[in-house]
Amino acid sequence: MIPGEIITPSGEIELNAGRDTVKLLVANTGDRPIQVGSHFHFYEVNYALIFDRELALGMRLDIPAGTAVRFEPGDEKEVSLVPLVGSRRVYGFNGRVNGEINAEGRGG
């Protein structure tokens, strides 16, 4: 082994295997690009992004950790979301939840 070497199993690694997903059509109605990171609570993203926010409560993008999706002005694209896991407590971001999200996705 080389110091710092990462040894992974052979084959493909499926991200978020077995998790429920939601697909949403998202439009950037603003005049600036908007970039959303992999673990940002999608319900609380910039208000220039128009989509069904209630479906995004308790969800994040279904993309690899450390990556992001960029929405250029006027862009409209479909994204896939997965539920936040763990304690399902959401604090910060834009301050819209600041507490627990129950199993149905509603603030608790």
Curated annotation (Swiss-Prot):
Which top-level enzyme class is recorded in the Swiss-Prot or TrEMBL entry?
hydrolase
Pfam families from the entry?
Answer: Urease_beta
GO (cellular component) term, any one: urease complex
InterPro entries tied to this protein: Urease_beta-like, Urease_betasu_sf, Urease_subunit
- List the molecular function annotations (GO) for this entry: urease activity
Q: Where in the cell is it found?
A: Cytoplasm
What's the main place this protein lives?
cytoplasm
tRNA-binding listed as a keyword: no
Q: Which UniProt keywords apply?
A: Cytoplasm, Hydrolase
Instruction: Give the pathway.
Output: Nitrogen metabolism; urea degradation; CO(2) and NH(3) from urea (urease route): step 1/1
At the top level, the lineage of the source is Bacteria
Assembly, in brief, is: Heterotrimer of UreA (gamma), UreB (beta) and UreC (alpha) subunits. Three heterotrimers associate to form the active enzyme.
Annotated family: Belongs to the urease beta subunit family.
State the protein's name. Urease subunit beta
Please tell me the species this chain comes from.
Nostoc sp. (strain PCC 7120 / SAG 25.82 / UTEX 2576)
Q: What would be the name of the gene that encodes this protein?
A: ureB
